[in-house]
């Protein structure tokens, strides 16, 4: 089928003024219109969560992060982890914090004694109301006064120009879902037919530096269920090797070159096929957190 034929088959046009987006399925049109109004009708029902998403595939990915089995519990703070490696790293952070806090207390007490002695020698004597904080700035002392106080592993968001940094136990996947995936995208120039098939938000811009640049897209439209079936027909026995080539496994994309990163590949699946394979999300989790691969998949 030609590109013209595919364009004519898109009968569902966005009704927002100035928007020319057209889709071949009413569900994609509704998801696109949600981006105009910032409506997020897909709610997480996990107790205490309440996160909301524009598209159902985003909710499915998010709910997977809740369903992770974390059998390794810290006896000091009750945080839970997937692997022994994660737990050991976390326990080491407790030990480092304890040692550093002791050094801070000893050093801080010595500095305060010197400050008090100096003030006692001045006219007016020592003011007992002086904050027992940093002698340099007069503020209450906090961990933030010392860079590197918490030297646990940190994770930088992989999206360009995003300064988000999460601690080891935070969920970077959810940050990416809420702030990047399906919200900002650079559409390759020179092919206006692509712009008709991609759900975008009012904030999307071809000059947005937080976008993933120059992704490759398929212009064929298939339903979410068809896309899932065509990909999950090959259930990977080893997700690490299955996705490590950063290639789309969809039958329509076999000729595409590998994507620059696993995050570009996730973005491609989301925008082109309207779903994200669960095993790809698990692989990206491995890519971010670097635990033992089989520890993560043994459930």
Curated annotation (Swiss-Prot):
What subcellular compartments does it reside in?
Nucleus
Indicate yes or no for the key word Acetylation.
no
- Keyword Ribonucleoprotein carried by entry: no
Its keywords, alphabetically, are: DNA-binding, Metal-binding, Nucleus, Repeat, Transcription, Transcription regulation, Zinc, Zinc-finger
Residue span of region Disordered: 191-242
Top-level lineage group = Eukaryota
Instruction: Tell me any Pfam family this protein matches.
Output: zf-C2H2_4
Any GO BP: cyanamide metabolic process
Record PROSITE patterns: ZINC_FINGER_C2H2_1, ZINC_FINGER_C2H2_2
Predominant place of localization: nucleus
Show the ranges annotated as biased composition (Low complexity).
200-232
Sequence motif Nuclear localization signal, location on chain: 96-107
* InterPro entries hit by this protein: Zinc_finger_trans_reg (IPR051061), Znf_C2H2_sf (IPR036236), Znf_C2H2_type (IPR013087)
A single cellular component GO annotation: nucleus
One MF term in the entry's GO annotations: sequence-specific DNA binding
**Stretches annotated zinc finger (C2H2-type):** 12-36, 42-66, 72-94, 155-179, 246-271
Q: What else is known?
A: Present with 2120 molecules/cell in log phase SD medium.
Described by its record, this protein's role is as follows: May function as a transcription factor.
The molecule here is called Zinc finger protein FZF1
């Amino acid at each position: 089928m030609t590109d013209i034929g595919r364009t004519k088959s898109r009968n569902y046009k966005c009704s927002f003024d100035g928007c020319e987006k057209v889709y071949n399925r009413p569900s994609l049109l509704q998801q696109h219109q949600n981006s105009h109004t910032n409506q997020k009708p897909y709610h997480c029902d996990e107790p205490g969560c309440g996160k909301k998403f524009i598209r159902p595939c985003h909710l499915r990915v998010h709910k997977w992060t809740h369903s992770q089995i974390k059998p390794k519990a810290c006896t000091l703070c009750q945080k839970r982890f997937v692997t022994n490696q994660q737990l050991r790293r976390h326990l080491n952070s407790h030990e480092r914090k304890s040692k550093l806090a002791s050094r801070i207390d000893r050093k801080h007490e010595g500095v305060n004694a010197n400050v008090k002695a100096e003030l006692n020698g001045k006219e007016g004597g020592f003011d007992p109301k002086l904050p027992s904080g940093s002698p340099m700035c007069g503020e209450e002392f906090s961990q933030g006064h010392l860079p590197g106080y918490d030297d646990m592993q940190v994770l930088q968001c992989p999206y360009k120009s995003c300064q988000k940094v999460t601690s080891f136990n935070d969920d970077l996947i959810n940050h990416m879902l809420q702030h990047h995936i399906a919200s900002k995208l650079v559409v390759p120039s020179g092919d206006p037919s692509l712009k008709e098939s991609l759900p975008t938000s009012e904030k999307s811009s071809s000059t947005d530096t937080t976008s993933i640049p120059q992704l490759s897209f398929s212009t064929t439209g298939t339903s979410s269920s068809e896309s899932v079936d065509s990909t999950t027909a090959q259930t990977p026995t080893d997700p690490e090797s299955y996705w490590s080539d950063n290639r789309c496994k969809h039958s329509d994309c076999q000729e595409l070159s590998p994507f620059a990163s696993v995050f570009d590949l996730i973005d491609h699946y989301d925008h082109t096929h309207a779903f994200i394979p669960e095993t790809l999300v698990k692989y990206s989790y491995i890519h971010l957190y670097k635990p033992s691969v089989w520890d993560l998949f043994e459930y």
